[in-house]
A protein has these predicted regions:
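Intrinsically disordered, low-complexity terminal regions
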Residues: 1-308
Length: 308
């Protein structure tokens, strides 16, 4: 009977301890409004961040932070027309039982410079106009829609999405997938591992993938296409003075609206087939059309196919 009593008491103590550890407290729950803000800088930590541009000039920030770990805060500071929002934590007590949730939701004018940097979570930006918008995340998802101006996206792992950008896009992702659609300017993209999809690109497109596949559609001009291991498929993608293909293992398959006779071609494959229009060869294909520009390609194991 005593053993049963002791066991019951121990179970109750463990349950109480677990309940105490996992109890969540609201640390931040506030809405702040600002006028005459031209630039916002956010250091979000693990918090989700969103920005919605709209009519008016007032900036409104809704911040919420709930956690079972104390010593966390969201700090606001203004310096002239710059608003700085920072997640702060002085605690190192995180463990397997840590539970937290929170966000920073911002609404404000369309014309505003924005820079967001975080460690994890999600970043979602819509309807923004600035010379440069910078979004950086260690792990998580980054999405930007209806952006006027240049856009920089960076993440170590996760997903990058950009749509309707009236400017250039520079994107870097270590591991994960990226989707771009409706980019009026040039695109420079690099990734170590993952898949890349790009549609309706109005400028020069450069792609560098260590491992993964690239699917391209409606691209004004292809630049450097470098894929160490993987495949590139392009439909309605233009050739230009900077077009070149480089790969170790995989295939480059391109359907282009460009005049094939307006370019020279120097293509090489250690093991594989090479084709331009109706002309195909193994290992080496040289076509001299007395053109001003030459399309170059080199693949160790795989094929390069360029057709109309």
């Amino acid at each position: 009977m005593k053993n049963y009593t002791y066991a019951s008491l121990l179970a109750l103590l463990l349950l109480a301890s677990t309940t105490w550890v996992t109890a969540q407290n609201v640390l931040v729950n506030t809405t702040k409004k600002y006028n005459n803000i031209k630039q916002i800088e956010v250091e979000s930590g693990w918090l989700d961040v969103s920005y919605q541009g709209g009519e008016g000039t007032e900036v409104s920030v809704e911040a919420y932070l709930e956690s079972n770990i104390a010593d966390q805060d969201i700090v606001f500071a203004t310096l002239g027309d710059v608003l700085k929002i920072s997640y702060k934590s002085s605690s190192e007590k995180y463990n397997w039982n840590s539970k937290s949730k929170g966000y920073i939701k911002i609404t404000g004018p369309v014309a505003l410079a924005l820079e967001v940097s975080g460690t994890s979570g999600n970043i979602s930006i819509q309807n923004l106009e600035s010379k440069l918008t910078t979004l950086q995340l260690t792990s998580g998802n980054v999405a930007a829609t209806q952006i006027k101006g240049n856009l920089t996206l960076t993440a170590t792992s996760g997903t990058l999405i950009a749509k309707e950008v009236d400017g250039d896009v520079n994107a870097r992702l270590t591991s994960g997938n990226t989707s771009l659609d409706g980019i009026k300017g040039a695109v420079d993209y690099g990734s170590t591992s993952g898949n890349f999809t790009a549609k309706n690109i109005g400028g020069l497109l450069n792609v560098q993938l260590t491992s993964g596949n690239a699917k391209l559609e409606n691209v004004k001009e292809l630049g450097t296409m470098k894929i160490t291991s993987g495949n590139m498929t392009a439909v309605n993608a233009g050739l230009g003075s900077k077009t070149q293909f480089s790969g170790t293992s995989g295939n480059f398959t391109l359907q282009t609206p460009s005049d094939l006779g307006a370019f020279n071609y120097t293509l090489r494959a250690t093991s594989g087939n090479l084709r331009v229009g109706n002309t195909s060869k193994e290992k080496s294909l040289d076509i001299n059309n007395n053109a001003a520009n030459t399309v170059r390609g080199n693949i160790t194991s795989g094929n390069i196919t360029i057709t109309n």
